[in-house]
């Protein structure tokens, strides 16, 4: 998980959870079904061009709206390596870590363009834009949150701790 490379899919400000996964699909909790509809209201052809391992880059307040966990589950299951944005809605922030989806706060998202190739180094806290030869630092992820990501989310983390006899 430390270094990931992929292409950028650029979105704007205030991308709410209804744009990430529309409410009409909330009658299921099947991650594969959710993933098959991710971002379709924001960009109907998104999944036709998206490649697992790519990144979503956005502006302020990504994940605003409802508190549903379906949104980060859909993104993670679709294969989004990380969501990079200027800021995140707080409940989306926590839900993302709980489900094991890396989200990175970077103020310079305006400098990143659709189609750029990024290399994200989680350990170093850096994002290299290989297309534009630029490097950005992201807000450090607290150690416990990194543990959640490395475990695949809160449930998997708890299972591992139980198996170790820690919980």
From Swiss-Prot:
Similarity-based family: Belongs to the LeuD family. LeuD type 2 subfamily.
Mitochondrion listed as a keyword: no
Molecular function terms from GO: 3-isopropylmalate dehydratase activity
Self-association and partners: Heterodimer of LeuC and LeuD.
GO BP term (any one): L-leucine biosynthetic process
InterPro entries in alphabetical order: Aconitase/3IPM_dehydase_swvl (IPR015928), AconitaseA/IPMdHydase_ssu_swvl (IPR000573), IPMI_Swivel (IPR033940), LeuD (IPR050075), LeuD_type2/HacB/DmdB (IPR011827)
Gene3D superfamilies named among the record's database cross-references: Aconitase, domain 4
Function summary: Catalyzes the isomerization between 2-isopropylmalate and 3-isopropylmalate, via the formation of 2-isopropylmaleate.
Enzyme class: lyase
Pfam families xrefs: Aconitase_C
Keywords associated with the record: Amino-acid biosynthesis, Branched-chain amino acid biosynthesis, Leucine biosynthesis, Lyase
Catalysed reactions, semicolon-separated: (2R,3S)-3-isopropylmalate = (2S)-2-isopropylmalate
Name of the protein in question: 3-isopropylmalate dehydratase small subunit
